[in-house]
Curated annotation (Swiss-Prot):
GO molecular function, one term: glutaminase activity
EC number: 3.5.1.2
Protein name: Glutaminase 1
Gene: glsA1
N6-acetyllysine modification, residue list: 294
Length: 310
């Protein structure tokens, strides 16, 4: 049994030590994100037996952004299976920025990773759907099943992103021309933009992590969301590419599958034990929350979790 006092102390200490850390800046290429108060910070744990521990602004709802890629990957694995995902998307780090076009050009148009923009747009196109609205509703539903029913599209975020997503539209057409997009290019880009524009709070983000940690069963609803056999593929992708250009450094220092988003959220999974999440808007040059990385790493270190430990 996990010690409740120890878990709350770990969360409290991480928040106290790092919630006012200086450094980084909000994402400024999406107007909505540029205006989120930079002083916000939160950290939370949700365990596989459904206990919740949090500190800071844990009720504040922020944009899911790139963490949505984990949810859509999970749905694609359910729809088409791991072999098709590997064949049609890939399972390798690109070694380049998350929005790189060069990565596509270097590999014949294949996106390699479902956790970079090109691969995520291709993954969105893999979802079984008869039209754009069905594709979107299925992706929203998997987000809600994984994290909580309160997850919802923000029209403000979506509008802010849809008016600035020209780079992703270009990526979608490159994928389409290379044969690595499996629906209409602008449909894929539209739905991908929507999936990044949902709002959730830090506890819900930790619940997403706990659902993965529990082999696909949401520990708060007790409902099976994913096949247990598909979860290791998600965690492997998170370990390789979850923090963009910092993924190797994160694996080396923290040793947990993770995923960040430019909305300031960051998630880590301790398989079989818990999800750890944090939120704070200022980002490093790779697009990861400066304080969030420190808070999650602190919790993991205090509790002694690292998947590479014996």
């Amino acid at each position: 049994m996990l010690d409740a006092n120890k878990l709350q102390q770990a969360v409290d200490q991480a928040y106290t030590q790092f919630h006012s850390l200086n450094g980084g800046q909000n994402a400024d290429y999406i107007p909505f994100l540029a205006n989120v108060p930079g002083q916000l910070a939160a950290v939370a744990i949700v365990t596989c037996d459904g206990n919740v521990y949090s500190a800071g602004d844990s009720d504040y709802r922020f944009a899911l952004e790139s963490i949505s890629k984990v949810c859509t990957l999970a749905l694609a694995l359910e729809d088409v299976g791991p072999q098709a995902v590997q064949d049609k998307i890939g399972a390798d780090p690109t070694g380049l920025p998350f929005n790189s076009v060069i990565a596509l050009e270097l590999h014949g148009g294949k996106p390699l990773s479902p956790l970079v923009n090109a691969g995520a747009i291709a993954t969105t196109s893999l979802i079984n759907a008869e039209n754009v609205e069905q594709r979107w509703q299925r992706i929203l539903h998997i987000q809600q099943q994984l994290a909580g029913e309160q997850v919802a599209l923000s029209d403000e975020v979506n509008q802010s992103e849809q008016t600035t997503n020209f780079h992703n539209r270009a990526i979608a057409w490159l994928l389409y021309s290379a044969g690595y997009l499996y629906c209409d290019a602008m449909e894929a880009c539209d739905v991908y933009t929507r999936q990044c524009s949902t709002l959730l709070n830090t506890i819900e983000l930790a619940t997403l992590g706990a659902t993965l940690a529990a082999g696909g069963v949401n520990p708060l609803t007790h409902k099976r969301v994913l096949q247990a056999d598909n979860v290791p593929y998600i965690l492997a992708e998170m370990m390789m590419e979850g923090l963009y250009g910092r993924s190797g450094d994160w694996a080396y220092r923290v040793g947990l599958p993770g995923k960040s988003g430019v909305g300031g959220g960051i998630l880590a999974v301790v398989p079989g034990v818990m999800g750890i999440a944090a939120f704070s808007p200022p980002l490093d040059e790779d697009g990861n929350s400066v304080r969030g990385q420190k808070m999650v790493a602190s919790v993991a270190k205090q509790l002694g979790y690292n998947v590479f430990k014996g």
